């Protein structure tokens, strides 16, 4: 059966991996997933990621991050879903936890955090929220 929301699947794998205290999780590779992981790494929510091409299908190995035994990501949720896309202008981008969290946005300038999108004055599809 085909996967209807690949990005949502990756976020769920990250959430489940952190709840199970895993060091890393695997997710099928795609450009969008890699760009979202770059934002998470820049913002300090994951240690890093690498592409594993040893198998038939490329996989992304996501290195999870913990702080004093607690997951760095307390909450991760998909905002724009396949059945209901959510778009926002640069001035209307949601602020998560009074700026303590981030919103990941797909813009014409690439996948950015909400702060980067505001600084570049671009809006786009609101992919996920993380704190």
Curated annotation (Swiss-Prot):
A family per Pfam: Ribosomal_S8
Oligomeric and partner information: Part of the 30S ribosomal subunit. Contacts proteins S5 and S12.
GO CC terms of this entry: ribonucleoprotein complex; ribosome
Function: One of the primary rRNA binding proteins, it binds directly to 16S rRNA central domain where it helps coordinate assembly of the platform of the 30S subunit.
Intrachain S-S bonds: none
Keyword annotations: Ribonucleoprotein, Ribosomal protein, RNA-binding, rRNA-binding
GO MF term set: rRNA binding; structural constituent of ribosome
Gene (UniProt): rpsH
GO annotation terms (biological process): translation
InterPro entries: Ribosomal_uS8 (IPR000630), Ribosomal_uS8_CS (IPR047863), Ribosomal_uS8_sf (IPR035987)
Record family assignment: Belongs to the universal ribosomal protein uS8 family.
Highest taxon, organism lineage: Bacteria
Protein name: Small ribosomal subunit protein uS8
């Amino acid at each position: 059966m085909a996967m209807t929301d690949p990005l949502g699947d990756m976020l769920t794998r990250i959430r489940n991996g952190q709840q199970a205290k895993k060091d890393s999780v695997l997710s099928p590779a795609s450009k969008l997933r890699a760009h979202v992981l770059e934002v998470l790494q820049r913002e300090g929510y994951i240690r890093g990621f690498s592409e594993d091409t040893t198998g038939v299908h490329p996989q992304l190995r996501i290195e999870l991050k913990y702080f004093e035994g607690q997951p760095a990501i307390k909450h991760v949720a998909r905002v724009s879903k396949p059945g209901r896309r959510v778009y926002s202008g640069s001035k209307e981008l949601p602020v998560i936890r009074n700026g303590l969290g981030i919103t990941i946005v797909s813009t014409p300038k690439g996948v950015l955090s909400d702060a980067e999108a505001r600084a570049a004055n671009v809006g786009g599809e609101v992919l996920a929220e993380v704190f």
